[in-house]
UniProtKB/Swiss-Prot annotation:
Keywords: Kelch repeat, Repeat. SMART domains: FBOX, Kelch. Kelch repeats lie at residues 106-152, 159-207, 209-255, 257-304, 305-346. Residues 51-98 form the F-box domain. The keyword Cytoplasm does not apply. Pfam families: F-box (PF00646), Kelch_1 (PF01344). This is F-box/kelch-repeat protein At1g30090. The keyword Electron transport does not apply. Gene3D superfamilies: Kelch-type beta propeller.
Amino acid sequence: MQRVRVSSQRAVVHKLGDSQMTLSPKFRVAASIQSTLFDRSSELELSLRGEPLIPGLPDDVALNCLLRVPVQSHVSSKSVCKRWHLLFGTKETFFAKRKEFGFKDPWLFVVGFSRCTGKIQWKVLDLRNLTWHEIPAMPCRDKVCPHGFRSVSMPREGTMFVCGGMVSDSDCPLDLVLKYDMVKNHWTVTNKMITARSFFASGVIDGMIYAAGGNAADLYELDCAEVLNPLDGNWRPVSNMVAHMASYDTAVLNGKLLVTEGWLWPFFVSPRGQVYDPRTDQWETMSMGLREGWTGTSVVIYDRLFIVSELERMKMKVYDPVTDSWETINGPELPEQICRPFAVNCYGNRVYVVGRNLHLAVGNIWQSENKFAVRWEVVESPERYADITPSNSQILFA
Protein backbone atom coordinates (compact mmCIF):
# COMPACT_ATOMS: atom_id res chain seq x y z
CA MET A 1 0.00 0.00 0.00
CA GLN A 2 1.44 3.33 -1.03
CA ARG A 3 0.24 6.90 -0.84
CA VAL A 4 -0.13 9.95 -3.04
CA ARG A 5 -1.41 13.54 -3.51
CA VAL A 6 -3.77 15.59 -5.95
CA SER A 7 -6.71 18.09 -6.86
CA SER A 8 -9.80 19.19 -9.01
CA GLN A 9 -12.34 21.69 -10.60
CA ARG A 10 -14.63 22.23 -13.59
CA ALA A 11 -13.18 24.76 -16.03
CA VAL A 12 -11.28 25.18 -19.24
CA VAL A 13 -7.77 23.74 -19.03
CA HIS A 14 -4.97 26.14 -19.94
CA LYS A 15 -1.30 25.74 -20.67
CA LEU A 16 0.72 27.17 -17.80
CA GLY A 17 3.59 27.94 -20.15
CA ASP A 18 4.87 27.58 -23.68
CA SER A 19 8.05 25.64 -23.00
CA GLN A 20 9.23 23.30 -25.73
CA MET A 21 10.86 19.95 -24.94
CA THR A 22 14.08 18.86 -26.66
CA LEU A 23 15.41 15.32 -26.65
CA SER A 24 18.85 14.48 -25.31
CA PRO A 25 20.27 10.93 -25.41
CA LYS A 26 18.56 10.08 -22.13
CA PHE A 27 16.19 12.82 -21.03
CA ARG A 28 13.94 15.48 -22.49
CA VAL A 29 14.84 18.83 -20.97
CA ALA A 30 12.68 21.93 -21.26
CA ALA A 31 14.09 24.74 -23.39
CA SER A 32 12.69 28.23 -22.98
CA ILE A 33 11.39 30.14 -25.97
CA GLN A 34 12.86 33.60 -26.25
CA SER A 35 12.16 36.50 -28.53
CA THR A 36 13.26 40.09 -28.80
CA LEU A 37 9.65 40.94 -28.00
CA PHE A 38 10.21 39.80 -24.42
CA ASP A 39 13.55 41.52 -23.92
CA ARG A 40 13.83 43.78 -20.85
CA SER A 41 15.38 46.46 -23.08
CA SER A 42 12.13 46.60 -25.08
CA GLU A 43 10.14 47.16 -21.88
CA LEU A 44 12.55 49.90 -20.78
CA GLU A 45 12.43 51.59 -24.18
CA LEU A 46 8.63 51.65 -24.20
CA SER A 47 8.45 53.04 -20.66
CA LEU A 48 10.99 55.77 -21.48
CA ARG A 49 8.90 56.74 -24.50
CA GLY A 50 6.06 57.43 -22.08
CA GLU A 51 3.77 54.55 -23.05
CA PRO A 52 1.88 53.77 -19.82
CA LEU A 53 0.79 50.30 -18.74
CA ILE A 54 -2.60 51.75 -17.81
CA PRO A 55 -3.36 55.37 -18.83
CA GLY A 56 -3.71 57.65 -15.82
CA LEU A 57 -1.90 55.35 -13.38
CA PRO A 58 1.76 55.28 -12.32
CA ASP A 59 3.51 52.18 -13.66
CA ASP A 60 4.10 50.66 -10.23
CA VAL A 61 0.39 50.90 -9.38
CA ALA A 62 -0.64 49.60 -12.82
CA LEU A 63 1.78 46.69 -12.60
CA ASN A 64 0.46 45.82 -9.15
CA CYS A 65 -3.00 45.54 -10.73
CA LEU A 66 -1.93 43.60 -13.83
CA LEU A 67 0.02 41.02 -11.85
CA ARG A 68 -3.32 39.93 -10.37
CA VAL A 69 -4.78 39.01 -13.77
CA PRO A 70 -5.59 35.24 -13.82
CA VAL A 71 -3.41 33.12 -16.09
CA GLN A 72 -6.38 32.01 -18.19
CA SER A 73 -6.88 35.67 -19.25
CA HIS A 74 -3.32 36.21 -20.49
CA VAL A 75 -3.94 35.25 -24.12
CA SER A 76 -6.58 37.94 -24.57
CA SER A 77 -4.79 40.47 -22.35
CA LYS A 78 -1.49 40.46 -24.23
CA SER A 79 -3.17 41.82 -27.37
CA VAL A 80 -4.06 45.14 -25.66
CA CYS A 81 -0.70 46.83 -26.31
CA LYS A 82 3.02 46.13 -26.64
CA ARG A 83 3.78 46.55 -22.94
CA TRP A 84 0.99 44.16 -21.99
CA HIS A 85 2.35 41.73 -24.58
CA LEU A 86 5.75 41.91 -22.88
CA LEU A 87 4.18 41.18 -19.49
CA PHE A 88 1.72 38.45 -20.50
CA GLY A 89 3.64 37.00 -23.46
CA THR A 90 5.57 34.44 -21.39
CA LYS A 91 4.73 32.93 -18.04
CA GLU A 92 8.39 33.23 -17.03
CA THR A 93 8.21 37.03 -17.30
CA PHE A 94 4.86 37.19 -15.53
CA PHE A 95 5.80 34.97 -12.58
CA ALA A 96 9.24 36.57 -12.26
CA LYS A 97 7.52 39.95 -11.86
CA ARG A 98 5.06 38.49 -9.33
CA LYS A 99 7.99 37.14 -7.34
CA GLU A 100 9.71 40.53 -7.52
CA PHE A 101 6.55 42.22 -6.15
CA GLY A 102 6.11 39.62 -3.42
CA PHE A 103 2.96 37.88 -4.71
CA LYS A 104 2.57 34.40 -3.20
CA ASP A 105 -0.62 32.68 -4.33
CA PRO A 106 -0.97 28.90 -3.83
CA TRP A 107 -1.08 26.42 -6.73
CA LEU A 108 -1.88 22.73 -6.30
CA PHE A 109 0.28 20.47 -8.48
CA VAL A 110 -1.21 17.01 -9.01
CA VAL A 111 0.44 14.08 -10.72
CA GLY A 112 -1.80 11.29 -11.91
CA PHE A 113 -2.03 8.64 -14.57
CA SER A 114 -4.56 7.71 -17.23
CA ARG A 115 -6.40 4.50 -16.45
CA CYS A 116 -6.64 3.89 -20.22
CA THR A 117 -3.04 4.50 -21.32
CA GLY A 118 -1.06 4.57 -18.07
CA LYS A 119 0.45 7.91 -19.12
CA ILE A 120 1.72 10.04 -16.23
CA GLN A 121 0.72 13.71 -16.36
CA TRP A 122 0.82 16.76 -14.10
CA LYS A 123 -2.25 18.97 -13.69
CA VAL A 124 -2.15 22.30 -11.85
CA LEU A 125 -5.03 23.96 -10.00
CA ASP A 126 -4.95 27.71 -9.30
CA LEU A 127 -6.34 27.67 -5.77
CA ARG A 128 -7.35 31.35 -5.94
CA ASN A 129 -9.32 31.23 -9.18
CA LEU A 130 -10.07 27.47 -9.24
CA THR A 131 -8.88 27.02 -12.82
CA TRP A 132 -6.85 24.12 -14.17
CA HIS A 133 -3.59 24.40 -16.10
CA GLU A 134 -0.95 22.10 -17.55
CA ILE A 135 2.84 21.98 -17.40
CA PRO A 136 5.42 20.18 -19.55
CA ALA A 137 5.81 16.43 -19.09
CA MET A 138 8.58 15.16 -16.84
CA PRO A 139 11.73 14.47 -18.90
CA CYS A 140 11.88 10.70 -18.37
CA ARG A 141 12.93 8.31 -21.10
CA ASP A 142 11.64 5.17 -19.39
CA LYS A 143 7.99 4.49 -18.62
CA VAL A 144 7.75 5.00 -14.86
CA CYS A 145 5.39 3.36 -12.38
CA PRO A 146 3.02 6.17 -11.25
CA HIS A 147 3.21 5.20 -7.56
CA GLY A 148 6.87 4.40 -6.89
CA PHE A 149 8.45 7.87 -7.07
CA ARG A 150 8.23 10.59 -4.43
CA SER A 151 7.80 14.34 -4.81
CA VAL A 152 8.64 17.09 -2.33
CA SER A 153 8.45 20.85 -2.66
CA MET A 154 9.98 24.10 -1.50
CA PRO A 155 6.67 26.01 -1.63
CA ARG A 156 7.99 29.54 -1.03
CA GLU A 157 10.76 29.09 -3.60
CA GLY A 158 8.29 27.75 -6.17
CA THR A 159 10.34 24.60 -6.79
CA MET A 160 9.52 20.91 -6.67
CA PHE A 161 11.68 17.77 -6.76
CA VAL A 162 10.65 14.34 -8.08
CA CYS A 163 12.93 11.55 -6.87
CA GLY A 164 13.42 7.84 -7.45
CA GLY A 165 10.66 5.56 -8.63
CA MET A 166 10.47 2.32 -10.52
CA VAL A 167 10.40 1.36 -14.19
CA SER A 168 6.95 0.08 -15.13
CA ASP A 169 6.51 -3.69 -15.48
CA SER A 170 9.78 -4.37 -13.65
CA ASP A 171 11.30 -4.26 -10.18
CA CYS A 172 14.09 -1.93 -11.32
CA PRO A 173 14.32 1.14 -9.01
CA LEU A 174 15.51 4.54 -10.22
CA ASP A 175 17.98 7.07 -8.80
CA LEU A 176 16.64 9.84 -11.04
CA VAL A 177 16.05 13.33 -9.57
CA LEU A 178 14.09 16.01 -11.45
CA LYS A 179 13.59 19.63 -10.44
CA TYR A 180 10.66 21.79 -11.54
CA ASP A 181 10.84 25.59 -11.35
CA MET A 182 7.43 27.27 -11.49
CA VAL A 183 8.76 30.69 -12.48
CA LYS A 184 10.51 29.18 -15.49
CA ASN A 185 7.89 26.45 -16.08
CA HIS A 186 10.86 24.21 -16.67
CA TRP A 187 12.09 20.71 -15.68
CA THR A 188 15.80 19.97 -15.23
CA VAL A 189 17.64 16.74 -14.46
CA THR A 190 19.79 17.13 -11.32
CA ASN A 191 22.31 14.98 -9.47
CA LYS A 192 21.19 11.39 -8.91
CA MET A 193 20.47 9.90 -5.52
CA ILE A 194 23.20 7.78 -3.98
CA THR A 195 20.88 4.76 -3.87
CA ALA A 196 18.19 3.89 -6.41
CA ARG A 197 14.91 3.36 -4.57
CA SER A 198 11.12 3.28 -4.90
CA PHE A 199 8.25 3.50 -2.38
CA PHE A 200 10.49 5.33 0.08
CA ALA A 201 10.06 8.02 2.73
CA SER A 202 10.76 11.61 1.76
CA GLY A 203 10.38 15.00 3.36
CA VAL A 204 11.81 18.51 3.67
CA ILE A 205 13.32 19.66 6.98
CA ASP A 206 15.01 23.06 7.28
CA GLY A 207 15.42 23.29 3.52
CA MET A 208 17.07 19.87 3.18
CA ILE A 209 15.45 16.97 1.29
CA TYR A 210 15.57 13.54 2.96
CA ALA A 211 15.06 10.11 1.39
CA ALA A 212 14.99 6.94 3.49
CA GLY A 213 14.25 3.25 3.12
CA GLY A 214 12.10 2.02 0.28
CA ASN A 215 12.50 -0.84 -2.15
CA ALA A 216 15.60 -1.84 -4.09
CA ALA A 217 15.67 -4.41 -6.91
CA ASP A 218 13.47 -7.49 -6.42
CA LEU A 219 11.46 -5.49 -3.83
CA TYR A 220 14.27 -5.88 -1.26
CA GLU A 221 13.65 -3.34 1.51
CA LEU A 222 16.36 -0.78 2.24
CA ASP A 223 17.54 0.73 5.52
CA CYS A 224 19.87 3.40 4.08
CA ALA A 225 19.02 7.11 4.07
CA GLU A 226 20.43 10.23 2.42
CA VAL A 227 19.93 13.99 2.28
CA LEU A 228 20.07 16.53 -0.56
CA ASN A 229 21.22 20.11 -0.16
CA PRO A 230 19.27 21.93 -2.92
CA LEU A 231 21.74 24.83 -2.85
CA ASP A 232 24.68 22.78 -4.13
CA GLY A 233 22.73 19.82 -5.56
CA ASN A 234 24.75 17.21 -3.66
CA TRP A 235 23.48 14.11 -1.85
CA ARG A 236 25.22 12.70 1.21
CA PRO A 237 24.41 9.68 3.40
CA VAL A 238 22.92 9.95 6.88
CA SER A 239 22.45 7.31 9.57
CA ASN A 240 20.78 4.06 8.57
CA MET A 241 17.27 3.31 9.76
CA VAL A 242 16.65 1.00 12.71
CA ALA A 243 15.20 -1.60 10.32
CA HIS A 244 14.83 -2.22 6.59
CA MET A 245 11.49 -0.70 5.60
CA ALA A 246 9.42 0.67 2.72
CA SER A 247 7.15 3.64 3.35
CA TYR A 248 3.36 3.76 3.32
CA ASP A 249 3.20 7.38 4.45
CA THR A 250 5.56 10.06 5.75
CA ALA A 251 5.18 13.31 7.66
CA VAL A 252 7.47 16.05 8.98
CA LEU A 253 6.47 17.10 12.50
CA ASN A 254 8.44 19.21 14.98
CA GLY A 255 11.55 19.03 12.81
CA LYS A 256 11.51 15.22 12.63
CA LEU A 257 10.79 12.77 9.80
CA LEU A 258 8.04 10.28 10.70
CA VAL A 259 7.88 7.11 8.59
CA THR A 260 5.28 4.33 8.75
CA GLU A 261 5.02 1.15 6.70
CA GLY A 262 1.26 0.97 7.37
CA TRP A 263 -0.86 -2.06 8.11
CA LEU A 264 -0.16 -5.06 5.90
CA TRP A 265 -2.63 -7.87 5.21
CA PRO A 266 -3.46 -10.15 7.02
CA PHE A 267 -2.88 -7.72 9.94
CA PHE A 268 -1.22 -10.28 12.23
CA VAL A 269 1.68 -7.96 13.09
CA SER A 270 1.59 -4.36 14.27
CA PRO A 271 2.99 -1.98 11.62
CA ARG A 272 6.50 -0.69 12.05
CA GLY A 273 7.31 3.00 12.26
CA GLN A 274 10.48 5.04 12.68
CA VAL A 275 11.34 8.64 13.56
CA TYR A 276 14.46 10.48 12.34
CA ASP A 277 15.90 13.54 14.08
CA PRO A 278 18.36 15.38 11.79
CA ARG A 279 19.73 17.37 14.74
CA THR A 280 21.18 14.20 16.28
CA ASP A 281 21.32 12.12 13.07
CA GLN A 282 19.55 9.33 14.95
CA TRP A 283 16.60 7.02 14.23
CA GLU A 284 14.26 5.68 16.90
CA THR A 285 11.22 3.40 16.94
CA MET A 286 7.86 5.15 16.62
CA SER A 287 5.49 4.90 19.59
CA MET A 288 2.92 2.13 19.37
CA GLY A 289 -0.16 4.34 19.49
CA LEU A 290 1.13 6.57 16.71
CA ARG A 291 2.00 3.77 14.30
CA GLU A 292 -1.04 1.55 15.01
CA GLY A 293 -3.52 4.40 14.49
CA TRP A 294 -1.82 5.72 11.35
CA THR A 295 -4.37 4.34 8.88
CA GLY A 296 -4.39 6.93 6.12
CA THR A 297 -2.59 9.84 4.51
CA SER A 298 -1.23 12.53 6.81
CA VAL A 299 -1.07 16.33 6.85
CA VAL A 300 0.35 18.63 9.52
CA ILE A 301 -1.91 21.56 10.51
CA TYR A 302 -1.60 23.66 13.68
CA ASP A 303 1.57 21.61 14.41
CA ARG A 304 -0.63 18.54 14.84
CA LEU A 305 -0.74 15.34 12.78
CA PHE A 306 -4.06 14.70 11.01
CA ILE A 307 -5.09 11.63 9.02
CA VAL A 308 -7.44 11.28 6.05
CA SER A 309 -8.55 7.67 6.41
CA GLU A 310 -7.61 4.96 3.93
CA LEU A 311 -11.32 4.12 3.74
CA GLU A 312 -13.98 6.23 2.04
CA ARG A 313 -16.76 7.99 3.99
CA MET A 314 -14.65 8.15 7.14
CA LYS A 315 -14.01 11.10 9.42
CA MET A 316 -10.58 12.66 9.84
CA LYS A 317 -8.67 12.03 13.04
CA VAL A 318 -5.86 13.78 14.89
CA TYR A 319 -2.98 12.41 16.96
CA ASP A 320 -2.56 13.36 20.63
CA PRO A 321 1.14 13.03 21.61
CA VAL A 322 0.31 13.28 25.32
CA THR A 323 -1.87 10.16 25.37
CA ASP A 324 -0.24 8.50 22.33
CA SER A 325 -3.68 8.03 20.82
CA TRP A 326 -5.87 9.19 17.93
CA GLU A 327 -9.26 10.84 18.18
CA THR A 328 -11.91 11.61 15.57
CA ILE A 329 -12.46 15.29 14.85
CA ASN A 330 -15.90 16.91 14.67
CA GLY A 331 -17.64 17.45 11.35
CA PRO A 332 -18.85 15.28 8.48
CA GLU A 333 -16.95 12.45 6.86
CA LEU A 334 -15.18 12.85 3.51
CA PRO A 335 -17.75 13.75 0.78
CA GLU A 336 -19.07 10.86 -1.29
CA GLN A 337 -17.82 12.38 -4.56
CA ILE A 338 -14.22 11.76 -3.45
CA CYS A 339 -13.25 8.16 -4.22
CA ARG A 340 -10.00 6.31 -3.61
CA PRO A 341 -7.11 6.50 -4.19
CA PHE A 342 -6.56 9.83 -2.46
CA ALA A 343 -3.86 12.44 -2.91
CA VAL A 344 -3.62 14.72 0.12
CA ASN A 345 -1.87 17.99 0.91
CA CYS A 346 -2.48 21.12 2.98
CA TYR A 347 -1.97 24.86 3.07
CA GLY A 348 -2.68 26.97 6.15
CA ASN A 349 -5.69 25.45 7.90
CA ARG A 350 -7.02 23.80 4.73
CA VAL A 351 -6.59 20.19 3.67
CA TYR A 352 -6.91 19.27 -0.01
CA VAL A 353 -8.04 15.72 -0.82
CA VAL A 354 -8.07 14.71 -4.48
CA GLY A 355 -9.79 11.52 -5.49
CA ARG A 356 -10.35 9.53 -8.63
CA ASN A 357 -11.14 11.68 -11.70
CA LEU A 358 -9.42 14.54 -9.82
CA HIS A 359 -12.52 15.64 -7.94
CA LEU A 360 -11.35 17.74 -5.01
CA ALA A 361 -12.57 18.10 -1.43
CA VAL A 362 -11.34 21.16 0.48
CA GLY A 363 -11.55 20.81 4.25
CA ASN A 364 -11.42 23.89 6.48
CA ILE A 365 -10.08 22.87 9.90
CA TRP A 366 -10.45 24.88 13.08
CA GLN A 367 -10.15 24.34 16.82
CA SER A 368 -12.81 25.15 19.39
CA GLU A 369 -12.65 24.28 23.09
CA ASN A 370 -9.70 21.90 22.59
CA LYS A 371 -11.58 19.98 19.91
CA PHE A 372 -10.81 20.11 16.19
CA ALA A 373 -13.53 20.25 13.53
CA VAL A 374 -13.71 20.24 9.73
CA ARG A 375 -16.12 21.57 7.11
CA TRP A 376 -15.89 20.18 3.55
CA GLU A 377 -16.48 21.78 0.16
CA VAL A 378 -16.32 19.89 -3.15
CA VAL A 379 -14.77 21.23 -6.37
CA GLU A 380 -15.58 19.08 -9.38
CA SER A 381 -12.95 18.50 -12.04
CA PRO A 382 -13.25 19.00 -15.82
CA GLU A 383 -14.82 16.08 -17.69
CA ARG A 384 -11.60 15.56 -19.61
CA TYR A 385 -10.00 14.32 -16.38
CA ALA A 386 -12.55 11.51 -16.00
CA ASP A 387 -9.97 8.75 -16.54
CA ILE A 388 -7.18 10.18 -14.34
CA THR A 389 -6.21 8.59 -11.03
CA PRO A 390 -4.14 10.76 -8.66
CA SER A 391 -0.75 9.65 -7.43
CA ASN A 392 0.83 12.59 -5.62
CA SER A 393 0.43 16.32 -5.04
CA GLN A 394 2.40 19.35 -3.93
CA ILE A 395 1.63 23.02 -3.26
CA LEU A 396 3.82 25.80 -4.68
CA PHE A 397 3.52 29.58 -4.37
CA ALA A 398 3.92 32.02 -7.25
